[in-house]
Amino acid sequence: MAQVSINNDYSEWGLSTDAGERARLLQSPCVDTAPKSEWEASPGGPDRGTTSTLGAIFIVVNACLGAGLLNFPAAFSTAGGVAAGIALQMGMLVFIISGLVILAYCSQASNERTYQEVVWAVCGKLTGVLCEVAIAVYTFGTCIAFLIIIGDQQDKIIAVMAKEPEGASGPWYTDRKFTISLTAFLFILPLSIPREIGFQKYASFLSVVGTWYVTAIVIIKYIWPDKEMTPGNILTRPASWMAVFNAMPTICFGFQCHVSSVPVFNSMQQPEVKTWGGVVTAAMVIALAVYMGTGICGFLTFGAAVDPDVLLSYPSEDMAVAVARAFIILSVLTSYPILHFCGRAVVEGLWLRYQGVSVEEDVGRERRRRVLQTLVWFLLTLLLALFIPDIGKVISVIGGLAACFIFVFPGLCLIQAKLSEMEEVKPASWWVLVSYGVLLVTLGAFIFGQTTANAIFVDLLA
């Protein structure tokens, strides 16, 4: 696949097309990042990509499934039960798939190869900058969620190793704040400082194995529950329509693979919108099966008593669940640096454009700036993770932001793409597509505003 970069308007901002680190970071971990010549990267070039249709399905599924899986049983509880949770996901799936197809269409029309480049080219500079800022904030919040997940799983594993009863206070070295900090400084920080990402394939493998294993464990534990596990109240209907919307952040966070989808589309052997529609439909159906299996079985196992992280609801002594916790920790340890690289790349691009300095002119200070950016990012995410009690509070905020990537930006791209057409007489299909774009933007803005306001309101009352 062709080398990509974060900012596309090089002539205006004085940036070179050889953007070094930033040229590779906002791709899916599974996408080939080897640079090619301009001829090979062009639409008429002999090689449009190396990813097969089946491979693209796997990559999109891998990009979709992740840490949000742990919060789906709690989302079913919030939504008001199994029926409401299923209906909500099925309804959302139509918009999620259409957003992925719209991005591919706009990528093909604009000849851009990353999410933010497509938004920048189709919607203009202001929307492009907002998109980059949103990506930076989203990756920052996801990094916080990753550290909280590490602490959650370590608490359970340490309790078993130290043979401490649930909730009992142990020695200082088993304290949650200490164990999260130690793990972060020993493993995450060293992986985050380097300029290159050399462990992407391992992160992808661990993420896939861990996700499927967690799903299998949750389903098996529902079919053959342990005697000491008793479910709480099983809700059958939502308390209010607002309760259903409160489950939206988890679903948006879980299904958000749109940012990495554009590079995947351009890495395909046949990057055609029709083929891509089949790819994302198959991928989303697979992801839906995994999320629904985990959400339904986890919710029915524990009912309204389910934790925001479903693995915390299981006994510490359960060895099968302990293996799942170990998988999740390993997956998150390698996923945090990748998300951090993405966020750091966007911050770096925004900073250089603000300064009006090209990469080549500022290469002497690149390492010092990279280390400083990494340390500030790492310390802020760690500090917030130490004092935020569970991943549900983080997902409630960044899940609303994920709605912007799923609804708002694709909707704006569709509207702008259709408005740019020079037809004097607009056919009915033109009006339908523009109206659908308006619907996407309106729905996404509502979800973002409602969920973010609700998250802030709940946290202020807590």
Swiss-Prot record:
Localization annotation: Lysosome membrane; Cell projection, Axon
GO MF annotations, alphabetized: L-asparagine:sodium symporter activity; L-glutamine:sodium symporter activity
Residues carrying Phosphoserine: 28
A cellular-component GO term for this protein: neuronal cell body
Catalytic reactions on record: L-asparagine(in) + Na(+)(in) = L-asparagine(out) + Na(+)(out); L-glutamine(in) + Na(+)(in) = L-glutamine(out) + Na(+)(out)
Pfam family, one: Aa_trans
Family the UniProt entry places it in: Belongs to the amino acid/polyamine transporter 2 family.
Oligomer and partners: Interacts with the mTORC1 complex; this interaction mediates the recruitment of mTORC1 to the lysosome and its subsequent activation.
Entry protein name: Sodium-coupled neutral amino acid transporter 7
Organism field: Pongo abelii
Organism taxonomic ancestry: Eukaryota, Metazoa, Chordata, Craniata, Vertebrata
Gene (UniProt): SLC38A7
